[in-house]
C-alpha cells in the first residue's frame, strides 16, 4: 500500500508538481529590488545596503519555485547585468515611482536590455514601486514614461507596488505564474 502511494505521489508531482522559473530582477539603484526580494522571501522588511554583485533567493508561490536574482543597479555595474541573461524566463524591472528625474534613465536601461537576443522570450513584469510616497507616478504614467505600450512582441505587465508593505508584490507573481502556465505544456 505504501509503495502504491509513493508511486502515485511521484506521478502526481510529475503532472501537477512544482514548476520552476528563473527571474532576473533589475532596475536603477535604490529602486527597491533587495527590499522586494526579502519581503517576498521572508515576509518582512530588512535593512539593506546598495547591492554590489547580486542576491539570489528561492521564493515558492502557487506551486511555482521562483529563483530570483536581484542584481545591483548602480550605473557602473549595470553592464554586468548581461551575465545573468542566460536561461532567464522572466524579468522584474523595478522602478522608483517617486524618482521623476531618473525615469528616462530607467527607460533607456530597460530598452537596452529588452533588445538583447538572450531575453527575447522572457516575460516582463514592471514593479512601479514606492507607491506609498505622495508624489509617486501611478502605473499608467510609468507605462507611458517607459514606453511599455510599444512592446508588441513581448508579454508584459505593470504592477503598482510598495515594497515595505508588500502591496502589489504577490499580484505581480500571480501574473508571472499565469503566464508561465500558458507557456508550459
Curated annotation (Swiss-Prot):
Q: Which Pfam families match?
A: Arf (PF00025)
InterPro entries from the UniProt entry: Arf1-5-like (IPR045872), P-loop_NTPase (IPR027417), Small_GTP-bd (IPR005225), Small_GTPase_ARF (IPR024156), Small_GTPase_ARF/SAR (IPR006689)
Could you state one GO biological process linked to this protein?
Answer: vesicle-mediated transport
Family matches, as CDD domains: Arf1_5_like (cd04150)
What SMART domains does the record tag this protein with? Answer: ARF, RAB, SAR
Q: What is its main location?
A: Golgi
Superkingdom is: Eukaryota
Spell out the subcellular localization from the entry. Answer: Golgi apparatus
Q: Which GO terms describe its cellular component?
A: cytoplasm; Golgi apparatus; plasma membrane
List of residues binding GTP: 27-34, 70-74, 129-132
Signal peptide positions are none
Molecular function terms in GO for this entry? GTP binding; GTPase activity
The record ties this protein, via SUPFAM superfamilies, to: P-loop containing nucleoside triphosphate hydrolases
List the N-myristoyl glycine lipid attachment residues: 2
Per UniProt, the keywords (alphabetical) are: ER-Golgi transport, Golgi apparatus, GTP-binding, Lipoprotein, Myristate, Nucleotide-binding, Protein transport, Transport
What is the stated purpose of this protein?
A: GTP-binding protein involved in protein trafficking; may modulate vesicle budding and uncoating within the Golgi apparatus.
Question: Could you say which protein family the record assigns here?
Answer: Belongs to the small GTPase superfamily. Arf family.
Q: What is this protein called?
A: ADP-ribosylation factor
Source organism per UniProt: Neurospora crassa (strain ATCC 24698 / 74-OR23-1A / CBS 708.71 / DSM 1257 / FGSC 987)
Query: What lineage, starting at the top, does this entry show?
Result: Eukaryota, Fungi, Dikarya, Ascomycota, Pezizomycotina
